[in-house]
Amino acid sequence: MPDEDLYPSRIGGTEQIIQRKDPVVYGDTQPEVAHTLNTSQLYSYDENGYIVLPEHMPDMVTPLQDEINLLKRSMVNHDELITEPDSKAIRSIFSPNVFSKLIDRFSRHPGLLNIARQLLGSDVYITQARVNVKPAFNGRSFAWHSDFETWHVEDGMPRMRALTAWIMLNENNEYNGPLYVIPGSHKEFVSCAGTTENKNYDKSLRKQEA
């Protein structure tokens, strides 16, 4: 028999709130390992569902900015380059680690890997990588959403043993399209009503609709 779906969603019916069934932090402090979180940082991540690390690996910002500008020109005819729904302005670039040796090396940097391994209590792999360009004046918003709900329903990820590492390459503030989060929302799963059409991602990557 197939395993029970602990987080059913988009199977018709109505919306519902399901309490998280999985731990948030699987590992512990590792003072002997470089680039890991201390006790207070682990507690903050466990309670809030995210943690911000200012000035983390600042030497990588300029090289990554330059590399992304190269990808924006070299990947014009690739399916992995997603444009805005009403223009040719670039919205996202998927799998940049596949097309860029620099980004591939960066994705393996201990400053990322050691924290991810600590939080998940295991070795890790990349299930999805992307660059969100969000061009000034032309860029469109990303609606409120749960990454895991999409990964679970559309990609088949069974449990919440996953995380997102987000590298801010520009100042993130209230007037340039910042990322908003709801502290503590990771403790509940929002099960969505309705169903999902085949290849929903073809449209949702360009424009998100409730």
Task: Locate each region found by the language model.
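Internal hydrophobic scaffold segments of catalytic domains
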Residues: 1, 58, 66-69, 170-182
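Short C-terminal domain-edge/linker segments immediately following a structured domain
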Residues: 82-87, 157-163, 194-202
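Short, conserved beta-strand element in jelly-roll/cupin
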Residues: 119, 152-174
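Short acidic/polar capping segments at secondary-structure boundaries
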Residues: 131-138, 148-149, 169-174, 184-188
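Conserved active-site beta-strand-loop modules that form the wall/rim of enzyme catalytic pockets
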Residues: 140, 165, 176-180
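Double-stranded beta-helix
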Residues: 172-210
